[in-house]
Amino acid sequence: LTAVFTRRNPENALARRNLVLDRMASAGAITRYQRDSIAALPILLNYKPVSHNEGPATYFREMLRLTMNAERPKRRQFQNDWDYEQAVKEYDENPIYGWCLKNTKADGTPYDIYRDGLKIYTTIDSRMQEYAEQAIQKQMESVIQPQMDAQFKRTKTLFIDADRQERERIMRNAIRYSDRYYQMQKAGVDEKTILASFDKPCPMKIFTYKGERDTVLTPRDSILHHKRIMRAAMVSLDPATGFVKAYVGGPNFRYFKYDMAKQGKRQIGSTIKPFVYTFAIDHLGLSPCTPVPNLPVTIETANGVPWSPKEAGKVEQNGEMHPLSWGLARSRNNYSAWIMKQAKQPQAVANFIHNMGIHSYIDPVPALCLGTSESNVYEMVSAFSTFANEGVYTTPIFVTRIEDRQGNLIASFAPRTQDAISEHTAYTMLTMLEGVIHSGTGGRLGWAYNMQNVEVGGKTGTSQKNRDAWFMCVLPKLVAGCWVGGEDQAVRLVSRGEGSVIALPIVGEFLNRIYADPSTGISKQDLFTRPAVMPVYDCDETEKTDDSATRYEEDEFFE
């Protein structure tokens, strides 16, 4: 084949084509006039080599490559023992991790995903993947990035609340991890010359959400430009099967290699609150209608220092009694703290949350109820799927089978499941998460994306000082989550950077595209599975439509 490969051997390819034309003419398949006319034409190629930087699901493909080629985790790769132990457990128990090293061919050598002709069947739905990428592109291009650009133009400040030492540290690390630095160092260029090159203007391409742009900048200014680009990540999966349907780790894999869907972890803010409320229902015997006083809460911590969370903005704490569901819908910090005070043991709450699917380390302190811990979109979506899967946690799965080049099955994969909570608790939490959408901080999904009459639950989240914006969404057949933020936590939107403002619209856009495509199998008529015997909770306040609440942009900072 190489001998007549058009790109490598154009003369041989031309001779071979004309030979075929001669034989077709001799057989009467074409006339001699047609043969002569075609033979006079050159062979034109529309050749474009396949690049790992382009095409659909670039972040997913890279995650798959890294996963299948992964070595057993080492302690030095993790900040704490807990995360290291969880990574080792996942590596040992999940066969897709390190598959190429764990399995060998007949000759005893490991599999090579590049050379062995493997056919890897993934769970990604090409339609949903496209819709997720389109939703992120639309919101980032039209709303979020212009907001950041306007802020930078107004303030002339990129790294918010960062002193000179911190700004220098950020830039120093960015330079030393850049491809330019690596290539020059590899070529033997000395450090002084390398660093000087970052201040010399040169022609280059830079990323914008409107497309690549040719310009002349210093490499240092190029780094600053790309630091200003806001990032977003989204994951969606089928809660019943654990199949990952869409996976977007960032805006453009060529320019931003770091995967914020699974690789990067950020503070999860109020997206942890549904799990704290689940503990209250499952372990403390409370219900959505349990009355709780709207008052400040103080808890004495293990070291004897009292802790009392603050509320964001001008929130009135007037002592009125409201049902527990009211606190979740409005994401009140004092209601989450009240649950922690009843629980008494933060470690018990942390263990419970781990069992529901958040395997990242959770510091067992009262403040865990406000989302001070870190996780990623992939993990959060899988944990939220427990609510839609009748209380059963299903590990995410993104490969179903692997075949060799002859089509022989050599590996198949199935999700692992564990009972996390009862189906009654799961359904109760679904009704409370619906309250977040229909009468709480997630109201924008209803009135802006026409989902007032859809069975959909969700939770907004915003970490301190708008560093991280989150939105998690639960449907009967799909769970989706989105994170928005800067590459560095010092890069953030000072105002209007809350989860309900910048993360929720991405999910809303994604869902509307799915609903508009019947072939996805997702419909606005889908219903959550209700247990055969289920108490009816009729909390008067949660049934009222509170327009001011649903249009409220929460500012869920914690201190």
What are these regions (language model features)?
Residues L1-Q183, I339, H354-N355, H359, ...:
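Non-catalytic, structured segments within soluble enzyme domains
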Residues T2-E11, V20-L21, A25, L45-G55, ...:
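Second-shell loop/turn segments in exported
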Residues N12-R23, S37, Y59, M63, ...:
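Extracytoplasmic/secreted proteins, especially bacterial periplasmic and envelope-associated proteins
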Residues K48-L66, L286-P346, Y393, R405-L430, ...:
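Conserved catalytic neighborhood of penicillin-recognizing serine enzymes
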Residues T58, T122-S142, N173-D238, F243-V248, ...:
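A penicillin-recognizing enzyme superfamily signal
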Residues Q86, N103, N333-H354, T460:
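A small/polar active-site loop signature that marks catalytic segments
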Residues D259, Q263-N303, S439, N512:
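Active-site rim segments in enzyme catalytic domains, especially the processed small/beta chain
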Residues P306-E311, A343-S382, G391, T395:
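Mid-domain, small-residue-enriched loop/turn segments at the edges of structured enzyme/sensor domains
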